[in-house]
Amino acid sequence: MARKALIEKWKKTPKYATKAYTRCRICGRPHAVLKKYGICRICFRELAYKGEIPGCKKASW
């Protein structure tokens, strides 16, 4: 329940620009968000594994 409230709070325009912070667009996670994609590392990993992120593939060496 708290997460839903925080996601709704995040969607609103902040009173001051410095109060804005990044959240994952898919799951709402506030930590480890990749700014370029706007999603967290966990969602990024899942989407990259499925091949849904263009130009990205899992590294293996």
Swiss-Prot record:
Instruction: Name a single GO cellular component.
Output: cytoplasm
Keywords assigned by UniProt, alphabetized: Metal-binding, Ribonucleoprotein, Ribosomal protein, RNA-binding, rRNA-binding, Zinc
Q: Which cofactor does it need?
A: Zn(2+)
One of this protein's GO BP terms?
Answer: translation
Under Gene Ontology molecular function, one entry of this record is:
structural constituent of ribosome
From which residue to which does the signal peptide run?
none
The yes or no answer to whether the keyword Ribonucleoprotein is present is: yes
Q: How is the cofactor bound?
A: Binds 1 zinc ion per subunit.
Record-linked InterPro entries: Ribosomal_uS14 (IPR001209), Ribosomal_uS14_bact (IPR023053), Ribosomal_uS14_sf (IPR043140)
Residues noted as binding Zn(2+) in the record, renumbered to the chain: C24, C27, C40, C43
HAMAP family tied to this protein: Ribosomal_uS14_2_B
Function as written in the Swiss-Prot or TrEMBL entry: Binds 16S rRNA, required for the assembly of 30S particles and may also be responsible for determining the conformation of the 16S rRNA at the A site.
**Subunit structure, briefly?**
Part of the 30S ribosomal subunit. Contacts proteins S3 and S10.
Q: Which PANTHER family match?
A: 30S RIBOSOMAL PROTEIN S14 (PTHR19836), SMALL RIBOSOMAL SUBUNIT PROTEIN US14M (PTHR19836:SF19)
Family statement: Belongs to the universal ribosomal protein uS14 family. Zinc-binding uS14 subfamily.
User: What name does the UniProt record give this protein?
Assistant: Small ribosomal subunit protein uS14
Report the gene name. rpsZ
